[in-house]
Amino acid sequence: MSVRPMAYETQFFGFTPQTCMLRIYLAFQDYLFEMMVVVESVILKKLEALPAVQISRFEIRKSTEKFLHFMKARFDQLFEKMEEVLLQLVLSIPDNVLLPEDRVHQQYPYSQEEFCALQDEISQLQQQCRAEAAAGQALRAELEEQRAVQAELEKVVQWFDGLENVCREHGTGNFKESLVFLTQNCKKLQDVLRDVEEKSKKIKKRQQLL
C-alpha cells in the first residue's frame, strides 16, 4: 500500500485515498477467500461421488490453501499496479486545481513577511483595545465619583438656599453681614457645582467616543 501523504486529496474527498484503496483491497481479499471456500466444498462433493478415488479431506484442504496462496500473490501484484493507476489518475488532484475554500489565497496572495507584518499589526490593535478598555473603565469610575461629589454639593447648596431664605424671612440687622457672607459662599458653591457638571458632561462625551 502507498504511504505517500495526500493531504490535499484528503481535504477534498473527506477521506485518505490510501484508506479507500485499503478498503478495496480488503473487499477483493474477502471475496477471494469466500470463493476458495466454495471451490473446496464443490471439490469435496465431487469426490464423494467418486468412491474409487483415494484423496482425503486433509489433502484437499492443503491443496486449496496452496492454491489460495498462489492466487493471493498474483492478486497482490495486480492490485499494486491498479493502486498506482487509481492514485495517480483518479484519486489525485492536479497541481493547478484549487479547492473552493482555498481560492481566497489565490485572489489575495501574501508573502511570509506580509503575514508577519499583519500579525504584528493585529497584536498592536489588541494592545490598543485593551488600553482603551482600561481607560474607559477608569473614566467610568471617575464619573461615578463625580456623581457622588455632585450629589453632596447639591445637598450643601440646598442647605445654603434654605438658610438664605430663613435669613430673609427672620433676619435682623445682626445677621446682615452673616447673610452676605453666606450668600457669597453659596454662589461660590454654585460655581463649583456648574464646574463639576461641565466636567461630567465632558467625561460622558469622551466615554461615548470610546
Curated annotation (Swiss-Prot):
Biological role: Part of the MIS12 complex which is required for normal chromosome alignment and segregation and for kinetochore formation during mitosis. Essential for proper kinetochore microtubule attachments.
**Of which family is this protein a member?**
Belongs to the mis12 family.
Q: Can you tell me which residues the record assigns to a coiled coil?
A: 124-208
Provide the protein's localization. Answer: Chromosome, Centromere, Kinetochore
Which InterPro entries did the record assign?
Centromere_Mis12
Pfam families to which the protein is assigned, alphabetical: Mis12
Sorted alphabetically, the Gene Ontology BP terms of this entry are:
attachment of mitotic spindle microtubules to kinetochore; cell division; chromosome segregation; kinetochore assembly; mitotic sister chromatid segregation
> In its UniProt entry, what is this protein called?
Protein MIS12 homolog
- Cellular component annotations (GO), alphabetically ordered: MIS12/MIND type complex; nucleus
Q: What are the UniProt keywords, alphabetically?
A: Cell cycle, Cell division, Centromere, Chromosome, Chromosome partition, Coiled coil, Kinetochore, Mitosis
Q: Does the keyword Coiled coil apply?
A: yes
